[in-house]
């Protein structure tokens, strides 16, 4: 199985990928464009989606809405990671189908715990130790 990170900033994508690797051995795929990421989701099922909101082509919210229309993604956790701190965005994201919401800059321990909790494979005490 694999995790899909949809993030157009290469530095942010690298940081998120590095943090996720601390708690999973799953393949991690990075896509910089929402439309291309949506095409990937049509072709395969990811175990988790980590999505920025500000993307070229379509917003993270538009991406989530489109993914949630695919029945095979009904139970797949989607984490939105964005620099936008507006409470309105958080509410809209949850209403759209986002499972969890983190703001940038990402706090490493909280991010690793969130990923581990959703993947169900790494106890919280191991997350802090990695």
Regions of interest found by a model, annotated:
Residues 30-48:
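Acidic, metal-coordinating helix/loop segments flanking the phosphotransfer/catalytic sites
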Residues 10-29:
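Two-component/phosphorelay signaling modules centered on CheY-like receiver
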Residues 7:
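Conserved acidic carboxylate
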Residues 56, 86:
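The feature encodes the CheY-like receiver
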Residues 106-115:
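C-terminal output helix
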């Amino acid at each position: 199985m694999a995790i899909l990170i949809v993030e157009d900033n290469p530095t942010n994508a690298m940081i998120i990928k590095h943090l996720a690797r601390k708690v999973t051995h799953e393949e991690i795929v990075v896509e910089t464009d929402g439309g291309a990421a949506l095409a990937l989701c049509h072709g395969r099922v990811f175990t988790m989606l980590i999505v920025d909101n500000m993307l070229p082509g379509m917003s993270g919210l538009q991406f989530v809405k489109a993914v949630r229309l695919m029945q095979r993604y009904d139970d797949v956790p989607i984490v939105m990671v964005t620099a936008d701190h507006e409470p309105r965005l958080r509410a809209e994201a949850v209403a759209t189908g986002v499972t969890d919401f983190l703001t940038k800059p990402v706090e490493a321990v909280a991010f690793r715990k969130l990923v581990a909790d959703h993947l169900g494979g790494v106890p919280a005490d191991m997350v802090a130790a990695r």
